[in-house]
Amino acid sequence: MAIDENKQKALAAALGQIEKQFGKGSIMRLGEDRSMDVETISTGSLSLDIALGAGGLPMGRIVEIYGPESSGKTTLALQVIAAAQREGKTCAFIDAEHALDPIYAKKLGVDIDNLLCSQPDTGEQALEICDALTRSGAVDVIIVDSVAALTPKAEIEGEIGDSHMGLAARMMSQAMRKLAGNLKNANTLLIFINQIRMKIGVMFGNPETTTGGNALKFYASVRLDIRRIGAVKDGDVVVGSETRVKVVKNKIAAPFKQAEFQILYGEGININGELVDLGVKHKLIEKAGAWYSYNGDKIGQGKANASNYLKENPAIAAELDKKLREMLLNGGNGEQPVAAATAEFADGADETNEEF
């Protein structure tokens, strides 16, 4: 429908005034010739990249990873750092829990010599460091481990047993308002790792909730619920964890998908095992009995041997990874390897108390 000529002139004058006052690009039509595609960074897991729909975690946004203890939260975050560093990006790790193991990080592929690390004394200090790094425009990925460890200054200076109702929630709410715009302008990915608590007196529904108030839930573009669902064994020895990640919230693609992969102790996400599973599912790898073949050549008997073959031949693994991403991410018609969750699947941390 055509706009009245007088209105058109008034709108043009208003837009001109806004751009003059706030800068070019401060307001524009949504359909203008400007790429709306979101730049992403791989999570280190092919199946999780596919479940996210865009091929990874979005730059310029806030992401929350939460789950029970020893479920793989920090491992997943470190894998994101390793993937970002391989692309030449600068990363920072805000270690509020004072528990980062540099030896383990190095095993996961993190370049610890070029990783910025801070162990702040208070929650306010941690969030101010995040804001300063973001405003510099020079840092691409920031990890905060964890929200539960971001202790307000008043609580640290007070006595144990003192009541500090809602302090952490207010601190996080203020930080989200301040950080969201700066992250977008700097195109910086900020990942918050969070812990789970139990709500008291919940008779029906999920009693689980996350710490730090409700603000993080609203500002996060992606929320990932990570759980350990089993053990990976080599004979009788446990060598890793079977892990499931649910995409609880997703603003860049369809939510409620999930991915399953293995986290091997001392190695991280078993990407080669994922390549074998997805390759078989999408008929890029042939499976006859226990034997696996790629392009007519046998690559191993059993999944473990096939995975080892890909590990020893990174060029073939990269070729297979590229084919799967083209098939499943770039508008391909391949069947999605990750099924949408059922209608009963609910956000595992739907309502958050303000103080824990």
From Swiss-Prot:
GO-annotated molecular function: ATP binding; ATP hydrolysis activity; ATP-dependent DNA damage sensor activity; damaged DNA binding; single-stranded DNA binding
An example Gene Ontology CC term for this record: cytosol
Family annotation (SUPFAM superfamilies): P-loop containing nucleoside triphosphate hydrolases (SSF52540), RecA protein, C-terminal domain (SSF54752)
Domain of life: Bacteria
One protein family per Pfam: RecA
Keywords of this entry: ATP-binding, Cytoplasm, DNA damage, DNA recombination, DNA repair, DNA-binding, Nucleotide-binding, SOS response
Cell compartment(s), UniProt: Cytoplasm
Keyword DNA damage: yes
Gene3D superfamilies documented for this protein: P-loop containing nucleotide triphosphate hydrolases (3.40.50.300)
Segments traversing the membrane: none
Biological processes per GO annotation: DNA recombination; DNA repair; SOS response
Database matches in InterPro entries: AAA+_ATPase (IPR003593), DNA_recomb/repair_RecA (IPR013765), DNA_recomb/repair_RecA_CS (IPR020584), P-loop_NTPase (IPR027417), RecA-like_C (IPR049261), RecA-like_N (IPR049428), RecA_ATP-bd (IPR020588), RecA_C_sf (IPR023400)
CDD domains: RecA
Residues that, per the record, bind ATP: 67-74
Function: Can catalyze the hydrolysis of ATP in the presence of single-stranded DNA, the ATP-dependent uptake of single-stranded DNA by duplex DNA, and the ATP-dependent hybridization of homologous single-stranded DNAs. It interacts with LexA causing its activation and leading to its autocatalytic cleavage.
Family note: Belongs to the RecA family.
Protein known as: Protein RecA
Protein species of origin: Yersinia pestis (strain Pestoides F)
Gene that specifies this protein: recA
